[in-house]
Amino acid sequence: MSCRLLFLILFSVTVHYLNAQVVRFSENDTTYIFGDKVNVRSESSTTAATVAQLVAGDEVIIIGETETKTTLNGVELPWYQIRFQNNQKGYVWGGLLSVLRKSTLKDVRFVAGVTKAVKPKADEAAQYSIEVRAIRNGTVLQKVANTIKNEGSMYYRPLEVGARGLKGYKALLIVEMGYEACGYPWNEWYILWNGSQLHSLPLCESVADGGVFAHVERYEFPQGPDENTPGHIGKEDEIFFTIEFSATEELEDASGYNEDSWKRSRKLRWDGKQWLKPVNMGIPKD
């Protein structure tokens, strides 16, 4: 049984509504500039002449991906030819484009990108520094950052206006990273917007291995992600961190299996500055 199918069967609330796309730009895609001040080049090179300068949040249309790749701060990405203001054309490095594509709430634009990649050891997964920014009229209002240790692909979900009914918040962003394969971790980063500030939630990490085991982490809000998935039964200003676990072990004499499964949910705590994950999330006692 595949890991994707296992997640669907055991914990359909987690991935049933997933609408992620691999962050790879195609012709006619529209996105925003992620960098603060970005020089648009005449060719796909950092030494080419500058034809224009764009600021964070400026909208661009992808003409096409080039064969040229550049590595900056450990991040290797291709260059793209783009079209921008007044039908001008030029080239920018992929790391300066937002992976969130068009994510807007009124006059605020949200962008995200990888700012750095470090591989501590040859046999360890790379650590990616990811940043999300809220921008109005070219000015960065606020930004939050996180480090994800994962070499899978980066995915994103559409901006969720209303933040799933969480009182005091206007929107929810979710950035994901991982492999769609057994035995590899899958990370989810939730970011909340209250109209003036971005609040980052602690990372969720899930992993599954065929029909052997599955460990799924997620956040539950007052409202579910879709009409078929209910929210939690707590208050409107509460977020719950939930872990669901399932494992199957064959008996030594091959006469059968032992199955173990449990679910645990605990409220996050707001300390006045940030949301803190509950610490009492261990394996339930028999």
Task: Describe each region flagged by the PLM.
Residues V132-K149, W189-L203, L268-K277:
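Surface-exposed loop/turn elements that mediate protein-protein interactions on large endomembrane-trafficking
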Residues L97-P158, Y257, M281-G282:
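Terminal domain-start segments
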Residues N73-V75, K121-Y128, C182-W186, N258-W262:
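Short, solvent-exposed loop/turn segments at conserved positions within beta-propeller repeat blades
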Residues V22-F25, G74-V118, W186-E205:
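Boundary regions of SH3-family modules and the immediately adjacent low-complexity/disordered segments
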Residues V40, Q127-A134, E188-I191, A247, ...:
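Hydrophobic beta-strand positions in blades of beta-propellers and related beta-sheet-rich domains
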Residues Q21-S45, V51-E59, I63-T66, N73-V75, ...:
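SH3-family beta-barrel domains
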Residues E160-V161, K167-G168, I174-E180, P185-E188, ...:
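Short aromatic loop motif centered on NTY/YTY
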Residues M1-R24:
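Bacterial Sec-dependent N-terminal signal peptides
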